């Protein structure tokens, strides 16, 4: 992916050094530039594109749930790759409307919010996507554990929502508890793999778990 020369950002009077570094990274990130050029709301769209190219997640999907939908890049990709699919998403943050996608602004961990998702989908899901991460506090292990608890809840929800043979994809932060998640998924799915798509930043601890061929039995404690 070709990129223009590295752009530097002058530190404004009210801008911190950290925010200046973030802005400079954004300006020089080829995936940010490509997302803008192709009309995607975030560079994260290319993570799903790359995962789909490797694991064929969207081709035959008819019902899709997008957990942590904001700002909407993953659902944009799903809409494009699976135009026939019913797509339902949820996030604590507001996400601007996407044509053909039903969006709820709710806390996913609220059982009532999960009921809304299931009702709106109108049937068993073929694919549950989760790009969720807990709000960080700056303590690596605490951030890891909080995010993993969220992902495990997403996995349990997927087991209650997917059709037999369906798939679950989730963002994971490395740090130890991810091993428990993989063990859980191996009980629920016939195939569990992991990947770090090229669009994931090298310095990030994130990776993605891809669980396919759901066995058809909901998680039992």
From Swiss-Prot:
Residues holding S-adenosyl-L-methionine:
72, 74, 91, 107, 131
**Could you tell me the keywords of this UniProt record?**
Cytoplasm, Methyltransferase, rRNA processing, S-adenosyl-L-methionine, Transferase
The terms under GO molecular function for this entry are: rRNA (uridine-2'-O-)-methyltransferase activity
- The EC code for this enzyme is 2.1.1.166
Query: Reaction(s) catalyzed by this protein?
Result: uridine(2552) in 23S rRNA + S-adenosyl-L-methionine = 2'-O-methyluridine(2552) in 23S rRNA + S-adenosyl-L-homocysteine + H(+)
Active site at which residues?
A: 171
Similarity field: Belongs to the class I-like SAM-binding methyltransferase superfamily. RNA methyltransferase RlmE family.
UniProt function note:
Specifically methylates the uridine in position 2552 of 23S rRNA at the 2'-O position of the ribose in the fully assembled 50S ribosomal subunit.
Spell out the protein name for this chain.
Ribosomal RNA large subunit methyltransferase E
